[in-house]
Amino acid sequence: MARVGPEAWLLRLDAWLAPFLAALPRVEQRRWAPLYVQGLLLPGERKSVEPMAARVAPGQVQQLHHFVSTSTWPHERLEPVLGGQADRLVGGPDAVLVVDDTALVRQGRHSVGVQRQHCGQLGKQANCQALVSLPLARGEVPVPVALRLFLPERWAQDSGRRGRAGVPPEVTFRPKWQLALDEIARLRAQGVRFGCVLGDAEYGKVAAFRHALDEAGLPWALGLPPNQKVFPPDVTVAMPEPTRRGGRPRKHPVPSVPSVAVSFLFADPPDAALRTLSWRRGTNGPRRPEVAKVPPAATGGKPPEGAFAARRVRVADGPEAAGAQHLPGEERWLVCEHRTTGARKFHLSSHPAEASLEQLAAAIKARWSCEQAHQQLKEELGLDHYEGSSLDER
């Protein structure tokens, strides 16, 4: 591929930015936006305002800082432009919308939403801001289309912190899965096309999230915690007989068999009788799944690169029954992924009953594109260098 010179690169950037600039209401915003984006794209150790200004607008740090932190960006006008551009690039029935979290580590306590909470970047509790992220992806190309700040419940109820960070009264605590549903609805209303919603167990464990996707007619493949209870697909439900002759009728129906945790449904290490798939990772990400040539049991129980097995189940997410237990819900695919590290991951999918194991594994592993997007946003575009501390600074 021929190298693109600086003049051609800037012309391409100008063409890409043109519809976004048209959505900005102020002349000074239209002037500073291209310089800010150039600062993010150009090489540099830090992507905060001062070092970027030194590279793209020497001597004009205050002007660039005003654009980033004081000048209000009309996101409601910019988001449809981003959605349209993303759909043109990667949208379609074979695209996926990935729901995930990413965290920005922070030192102080005054930035909006900062609290000691789980930080995936560090793999532990840390002082950070949490963002709900939704990249649209097809193949190996992810395009971030939504990034929403999560306000922890305790933080959202602290009037002092809210006031200092400029959080308006109408912005209240919403769980991450509800923020994700808000963004999914917005993207669909803007005409962004995708065929499946993907997410990890933090979203997959929420029955209300799965049910909302069902009601919206959206197929999904989501992670699942190992203690999630499920029933076999042929389970039946009936009202039990009274405990004694002439006794009161029972209030709740009872399933024909008890539910079990998903971790008990697959052999560990993998059973040679189970059909497995290997996942071959290329330099640009996961490739398509292939039928494993050697069963895991023949290699000491270690699957080659990652092995998959699936079975039909009914999740215990139906109406509530006695003892705070839940009755069987809809029939779904339960997928067990055996990783080379020895870890097992469980996934639930609404794919149709005739879906192949290759199709299920391909959907699950498409979440890799979200990890790639987060890595690029932080390492190449300086997402974790952003210095805004209030909700108005966006």
Across the structure, where does each feature detected by a protein language model lie?
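Short amphipathic alpha-helical "interface-anchor" segments enriched in bulky aromatics
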Residues: V99, A103, Y203, H252-V254, ...
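Short intrinsically disordered, low-complexity coil segments enriched in acidic
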Residues: M1-A2, V313
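Generic structural signal of hydrophobic/aromatic residues within well-ordered alpha-helices
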Residues: W9, L13-F20, A33-V37, L64, ...
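Short, contiguous acidic/charged loop-to-helix segments that flank catalytic cores in large enzymes
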Residues: S389-R394
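An anionic, glycine-rich sequence signature occurring as long contiguous blocks
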Residues: G123, A137-P169, G223-P226, V230-A366
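Conserved, well-structured functional cores that handle cations and Mg-NTP chemistry
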Residues: A2-L198, E202-K229, T236, R244-V257
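Generic secondary-structure boundary/loop-capping signal
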Residues: L64-H65, S111, Q115, C119, ...
